[in-house]
């Protein structure tokens, strides 16, 4: 059986992973109906409320997401997974265990993230914000980096990503 591709979109909250990921999902679905869209916030709801936002819990959550992506990929399903994914160990695991793994790092400045803060995370002061209260491990070897400080629309970002993927 052919394995699916896992498009792992990673960045901090508010950088655009869900928006760009949803556009990518729709684009793939036009030609390949066997694709699913997974978002970190939704996955937390699906898996239940047993994990919080400590560094240890975030790592457990990220590994759940990674294993689910591998399971789906092993069954020939393409997966667009949008998650903060702040650990090198998780991204390394993905590269070692998911044959069709594509890592997309969407990078935005903290100033941009604070402006876009729809969830109120960057002003909450609750001590659990990745990239503010917890240092993240920025991806060292993403397949592509999409700078997203507002110079391009999500559709333009998608076009850059699609052009990159077509070259692969």
Per-region residue spans from a language model:
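Hydrophobic anchor at the beta1->P-loop junction of P-loop NTPases
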Residues: 9
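Conserved substrate/cofactor phosphate-moiety recognition/catalytic segment
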Residues: 21-67
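Conserved phosphate-donor/acceptor-positioning beta-strand/loop module used by diverse small-molecule
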Residues: 81-82, 97-116, 146
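Walker A/P-loop
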Residues: 18
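Loop/turn-to-beta-strand initiation segments
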Residues: 34, 74-82, 102
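P-loop (Walker A) phosphate-binding loop of NTP-binding proteins
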Residues: 12
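Small-molecule kinase domains that catalyze NTP-dependent phosphoryl transfer to phosphate-bearing small molecules
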Residues: 107, 115-160, 164-168
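ATP-binding Walker
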Residues: 15
